[in-house]
Design a protein with these regions (language model features):
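Extended, charged coiled-coil scaffold/tether segments in eukaryotic proteins
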Residues: 1-90
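Long mid-to-C-terminal scaffolding/interaction modules that assemble large complexes
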Residues: 55-137
Length: 137
């Protein structure tokens, strides 16, 4: 309907197809979820947000990548070949120093996570997943 794009890209680039669109869609969906639901008295803001979300479908790769990562890190004790492969496939570069591995997302030092070389308890993988999810997704 509009002649100009609704949004323009900034300087950040997609690390994988549709990544930035997913971040924008997620922010819009969160806002939409927080709006009051009034069946008999619709909200213009809710209608606009829903319309934008409907017009901008995406593959939802973030959810797939998070599920793969959560599966791989379940019960983490040490960096196995399966975990290493999953981390690399998701976009992490793995370097080791001392008692930790350093995970750098798409070789961008702004997005690093430290991973113990040996997990201290069964929650280690869950905690690592939560930290990665917070920093990356």
């Amino acid at each position: 309907m509009g002649e100009r794009p609704l949004l323009y890209y900034g300087n950040e680039e997609d690390y994988y197809q549709g990544e930035i669109l997913e971040f924008v869609r997620s922010a819009l969906a969160e806002k939409l979820d927080r709006l009051p639901k009034e069946k008999d008295n619709p909200l213009r803001s809710a209608d606009v947000l829903q319309d934008i979300l409907s017009a901008n479908e995406c593959e939802e790769m973030q959810a797939q990548r998070q599920a793969e990562l959560k599966r791989a890190l379940k019960g983490y004790r040490t960096l196995t070949p399966d975990i290493r492969r999953t981390l690399i496939d998701i976009g992490f570069k793995i370097t080791s120093d001392g008692k930790h591995h350093k995970l750098t997302y798409y070789d961008n030092d702004r997005y690093t996570v430290t991973m113990a070389k040996s997990g201290s308890d069964w929650r280690g993988g869950d905690n690592l997943f939560s930290e990665i999810k917070k920093r990356i997704y």
